[in-house]
């Protein structure tokens, strides 16, 4: 097993590039924007809108190379309208005519998110698949966040990984227009 180093990060460009590469084959990303060259720009827009700004952003390194990232939002976090407005041009650039699909996703999942305060794992992705990067990022995050946690798995193959960290599937949601399925998952507070 490779020993990875986890570092906190404020480098939105680096994190966006990692996530853009990590999600190149993601079913939801493909539905949202088939042009994989725009993925890093889309994650940059999401980070500009505020994801991770008050929570934690971890980068997983193998030697000196960044190979994964996780973005957590703290309980009660809602991006400010100013940050969201600042991100609109980035969203439009990344999504083009598919901007409405991004809004649909946000609107759909608002109803599945837990009402009680919780940590939200907005994104976790690895450029090295199947090598323990995701597990390392999840372990670090789960050791650091206190209280319940929530995520939306866009890939059914990742559900067993999240289940190993105590998450359970709470619903199965199919996106419109012949879209893929997404699985909201929740983990109660330890104890």
Spans of features found by a protein language model:
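Glycine-rich acetyl-CoA-binding "A-motif" of GNAT/NAT acetyltransferases
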Residues: 65-68, 157
């Amino acid at each position: 097993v490779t020993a990875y180093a986890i570092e906190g990060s404020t480098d939105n460009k680096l994190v966006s590039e990692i996530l853009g590469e990590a999600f190149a084959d993601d079913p939801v990303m493909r539905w949202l924007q088939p042009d994989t060259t725009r993925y890093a720009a889309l994650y940059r827009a999401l980070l500009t809108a505020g994801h991770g700004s008050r929570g934690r952003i971890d980068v997983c390194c193998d030697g000196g190379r960044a190979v994964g990232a996780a973005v957590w939002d703290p309980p009660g976090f809602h991006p400010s309208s100013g940050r969201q407005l600042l991100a609109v041009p980035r969203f439009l650039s990344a999504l083009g005519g598919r901007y409405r699909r991004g809004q649909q996703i946000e609107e759909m999942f608002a109803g599945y998110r837990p009402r009680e305060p919780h940590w939200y794992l907005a994104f976790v992705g690895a450029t090295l698949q199947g090598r323990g990067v995701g597990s390392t990022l999840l372990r670090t995050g789960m050791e650091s966040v206190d209280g319940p946690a929530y995520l939306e798995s866009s890939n059914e193959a990742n559900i067993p990984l999240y289940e190993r960290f105590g998450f359970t599937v709470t619903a199965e949601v199919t996106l419109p227009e012949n879209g893929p399925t997404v699985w909201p998952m929740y983990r109660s507070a330890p104890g």
